[in-house]
């Protein structure tokens, strides 16, 4: 059965317009995660940033954006790694249907 979403070999969508919440849920489940309300806040923030600037933010910028828009409780590396243990910028962008950030942890 063919992949229902156009992805590259690393699992990132090759067409950001093909993203939907089911894509995020299925990718997270494949990584052993269940997306919480906090995850969705980050994913929505990333998609908004991408829509406005045409790029996925690297880790430092992601942390700053989360702090500014969602508060310091989520806007720190420890909280972001708790949500996205394999690397917040990398995992969150994958689930959000965005390209892998150029410089991500």
Residue ranges and their predicted role:
Residues 15-23, 40-41, 55-58, 69-72:
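Short acidic alpha-helix initiation/capping motifs at coil-to-helix transition points
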Residues 12, 55, 98:
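Gly/Ser/Thr-rich helix-start
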Residues 7, 61, 67-105:
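Helix-rich interaction surfaces within compact, conserved domain-sized segments
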Residues 33, 40-45:
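Acidic, aromatic-enriched beta-alpha/helix-loop junctions
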């Amino acid at each position: 059965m063919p992949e229902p979403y156009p992805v590259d070999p690393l699992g990132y969508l090759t067409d950001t317009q093909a993203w939907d919440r089911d894509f995020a849920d299925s990718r997270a489940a494949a990584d052993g995660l269940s997306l919480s309300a906090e995850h969705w806040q980050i994913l929505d923030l990333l998609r908004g940033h991408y829509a406005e600037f045409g790029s996925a933010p690297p880790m430092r910028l992601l942390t700053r954006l989360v702090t500014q828009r969602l508060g310091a409780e989520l806007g720190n590396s420890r909280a972001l790694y708790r949500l996205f243990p394999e690397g917040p910028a990398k995992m969150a962008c994958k689930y959000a249907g965005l390209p892998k950030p150029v410089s991500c942890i």
